Regions:
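N-terminal carbohydrate-binding/catalytic regions of secreted carbohydrate-active enzymes
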Residues: 64-114
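Second-shell residues forming the walls of enzyme active-site clefts
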Residues: 77, 98-117, 203-364
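Short glycine/serine-rich loop/turn segments
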Residues: 143, 175-197, 219-245
Length: 396
């Protein structure tokens, strides 16, 4: 187990680097942290088997594609799910811990639980740490993307993201739900704001790619969001599902390039969101529940990694779907991993039961679910962390 003192020292150094770098309002030389983190990341095999899986592994596959959240500290329900290996990941919020010391302690305990359970794949610890207004560790952990974009170019962004990721890595985070790849083309936008690198795809795209590289440099996985792009809409899906009225040609020109750049840089995951996109053939189905829209990530952008939903507990989603219905609809649309995003007791079991029933009834394709689970497990093997590998434990 790593030393908490080491975690906090590393965090202090990293936040000091970020703060010092951002003091100037003008482009400045890249600050290279003196104690840069050098981490070997194994290459992940993107291909998954198309062979018919054993139906006996259905519950394991369902668990792999589920990400849970909860309120407060680890409770008995969460402990039971982790002990049984029934979830692929956990998404932590500021309500789960207090500052960097609390986060380090929490991730240590989570990994201790999953190590003792001897899972075949480590738990994936996830966090929304974009910087600016969307921060979980503590205020000021990292600057907002818009400010970063205005203070330097791609090398500058990469250095800042490397420093931020090194801090997250030391605090036990495996996958960051960042960077934001949305290009803010709608002046009436209410949700992206300074979370985006800007309104010009020619400027935003290389910065998104640099952010992905910086996160990897620091030892953390990267997630592009919010596909197919919230920057062209004016509403907030946490309240009501917004609409992007861009045509296919406009979308190709404004929103696609940044996602392409992030994918080319090696993004591990892409987050889909609740957004009506009639110009893309989504009709009256929100993008992350629309198979034709989600499929564009595979067929048009050539993405072979994990497709993960935005929170299924957002207000806009809840007005249309129950949580179990949303989980099934999201998987049916081609998402590999679902963020349940709800702290109510028992919600995980309801969602898992609904997915299982959908597989048994034939609504969900069994082989497709297995392939999704394999992609997720590859992601867990790459960015999940544990103290002792289960194969070593089983050999003793």
């Amino acid at each position: 187990m790593r030393s908490l003192r080491q975690d906090l020292v590393a965090f202090a150094v990293i936040t000091a680097v970020i703060a010092g770098t951002m003091l100037s309002a003008h482009p400045i030389p890249i600050a290279r942290p003196a104690a840069a983190v050098s981490i070997h990341v194994p290459v992940v095999e993107e291909r998954v088997s198309s062979a018919a899986p054993d139906l006996g592994s259905l519950d394991e596959d369902i668990g792999s594609v589920i990400v849970i959240s909860w309120r407060g500290d680890i409770n008995s329900g969460v402990r039971s799910l982790l002990d049984d290996g029934r979830v692929g990941g956990v998404l932590l919020f500021a309500s789960n811990f207090s500052g960097p010391a609390g986060l380090a302690s929490l991730t240590d305990r989570l990994r201790a639980l999953t190590t003792s359970a001897c899972l075949d794949h480590p738990i994936l610890v996830m966090l929304d740490e974009e910087g600016g207004q969307v921060t979980r560790v503590q205020a000021g952990f990292a600057p907002p993307a818009q400010l970063v974009a205005g203070s330097g170019g791609a090398d500058h962004v990469r250095a800042l993201e490397r420093a931020s990721a090194a801090g997250l890595h030391e605090l036990g985070v495996g996958l960051n739900l960042a960077p934001v790849a949305d290009v803010r083309t709608n002046s009436g936008d209410q949700v992206i704001l300074d979370r985006s690198f800007g309104a010009n795809p020619a400027i935003v795209s290389p910065l998104v790619g640099a952010a992905v590289q910086g996160l990897h440099d620091g030892g953390v996985g990267a997630t592009l969001k919010h596909f197919p792009g919230l920057g062209g809409s004016a509403g907030d899906p946490h309240v009501a599902i917004p609409t992007d009225y861009e045509s296919e040609a406009q979308w190709q020109r404004t929103q696609v390039p940044a996602f392409q750049a992030g994918i080319a840089a090696g993004a591990d995951a892409v987050m889909t969101t609740a957004l009506y996109v009639p110009g893309l053939g989504g009709g009256t189905t929100p993008a992350m529940f629309s198979a034709p829209v989600v499929a564009r990530l595979r067929t048009q952008l050539g993405f072979g990694g994990v497709i993960v939903t935005d929170s299924l507990s957002m207000g806009g989603v809840g007005a249309r779907y129950s949580l179990p219905e949303a989980a099934v609809a999201a998987i049916a649309a081609g998402n590999d991993m679902v963020l349940l995003g709800n702290g109510d007791p028992g919600y995980e079991a309801e969602a898992m039961a609904a997915v299982r029933a959908a597989v048994v009834s034939g609504r969900l394709d069994r082989v497709a679910l297995h392939q999704s689970a394999m992609r997720v497990n590859q992601l867990r093997d790459r960015w999940g962390r544990r103290f002792v590998h289960c194969r070593a434990l089983k050999a003793t």
